[in-house]
């Protein structure tokens, strides 16, 4: 099953919903960053959320950034997404290993206590930025809390990544259910009742259920209406020219030191780990264009 996001409404527009399957996307991230199982699960959950939240944005140029910064061994997780289903991300310490907690990967322990920041760049003078504390550091609950506190939108977020025995991704995905301001009390009660039928996202995905079927469990008795589907993938738009800007940003003195060393340098993109080499001649050319 290729990765995709489903968008839907229910209860005559009182509810909007998103669901996604993201196995290939999360596996691509794992391959790019060579992440440990717990790092894959943490990054995969945030990537899945980023893909769905990105699809909420209206314009082609809109960009979303999600940052989780905790005091656990992972350090931090950064994800960016556009409105077209393209998402990328990285974790500060990809090789962290932790013992399981209650038979599951200990994402909360790996992330630790900290903050979630959501930045939306929608082409306005200033990007929108909202920040909340991590309530469980398991990602889904933290986003539920963020939506309620920072955006005043009562929501339910479910995210999951299941690893295979060979440490590749067996399945991944998630859902976001949001109440509109005019949602009736009985609609909310019905969704709360329906949520009892969802054990975990990965339980349903590993049985072969689709995002549409997961939404049907959650909203099928509330007039579920699928409005659109869109593909989603791990995609990094880095290039040698873009990474060059990072080299320029270190300043003339640092670049001159690199030239004096007489060695080629290698710079890696944070988001996809692609390495770009710059020869001494290229560094001299960069130095000429450096302002400071």
Describe the predicted segments one by one.
Residues 196-292:
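Cys/His-clustered metal-coordination modules, chiefly Zn-binding fingers
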């Amino acid at each position: 099953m290729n990765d995709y996001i489903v968008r839907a409404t229910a209860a005559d527009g009182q509810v909007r919903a998103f669901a996604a399957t993201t196995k290939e996307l999360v596996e691509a991230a794992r391959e790019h960053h060579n992440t440990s199982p717990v790092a894959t699960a943490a990054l995969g959950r945030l990537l899945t959320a980023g893909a769905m939240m990105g699809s909420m944005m209206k314009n082609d140029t809109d960009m979303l950034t999600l940052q989780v910064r905790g005091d656990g061994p992972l350090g931090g997780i950064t994800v960016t997404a556009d409105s077209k289903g393209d998402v990328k991300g990285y974790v500060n310490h990809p090789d962290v290993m932790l013992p399981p907690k209650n038979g599951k990967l200990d994402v909360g322990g790996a992330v630790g206590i900290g903050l979630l920041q959501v930045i939306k760049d929608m082409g306005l003078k200033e990007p929108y930025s909202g920040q909340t504390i991590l309530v469980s550091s398991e990602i889904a609950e933290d986003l539920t809390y963020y939506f309620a506190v920072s955006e005043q939108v009562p929501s339910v977020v479910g995210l999951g990544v299941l690893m295979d025995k060979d440490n590749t991704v067996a399945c991944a995905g998630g859902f976001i259910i949001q109440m509109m301001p005019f949602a009736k009390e009985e609609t909310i009660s019905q969704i709360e009742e329906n949520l009892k039928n969802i054990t975990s996202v990965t339980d349903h995905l590993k049985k072969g259920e689709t995002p549409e079927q997961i939404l049907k469990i959650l909203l099928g008795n509330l007039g579920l209406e699928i409005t659109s589907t869109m593909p989603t993938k791990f995609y990094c738009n880095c290039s040698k020219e873009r990474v060059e800007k990072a080299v320029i940003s270190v300043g003339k003195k640092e670049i001159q030191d690199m030239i004096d060393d007489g060695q080629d340098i290698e710079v890696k993109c944070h988001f996809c780990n692609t390495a770009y080499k710059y020869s001494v001649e290229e560094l001299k050319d960069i130095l000429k264009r450096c302002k400071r």
